[in-house]
């Protein structure tokens, strides 16, 4: 049930906050969890699976009086899920929030020349956008900008109480974007 899942998210977060670690990791799902485990070598049980409930998980995290500047919140996953928070969609389930594609395209609309922008706008899905941006060599800049917008949105949601790092990956498990906010 949803309430049981949300209770498990609270437990994941409580355990992660109690751990003697410089970071806490949120991932929307198993895919992001596996990616982060591979990227950083962090044990799978140390990665908080927050599913579609990013806002709920962040609210639980905010309740912790021990939010410290020396602990970093890391979000790891696919931009199709994580970029939804840029526009304030904190429940990222497809029935509760729109596709992240328009949000991503809007976030980078002034970065590239018009011809490149038109190529990117032709994408049908976020994964298609990733492939298109890799072909025209704009992927690094595009997804660094998206990761930056995500980290800023989450940092603002947390009232700048802790640094936020974002690691974005494609479905092949390749790191495609990274950003960190410091406050």
Name these PLM-found stretches.
Residues 1-71, 81-82, 86-183:
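N-terminal loops that bind phosphate or other acidic moieties
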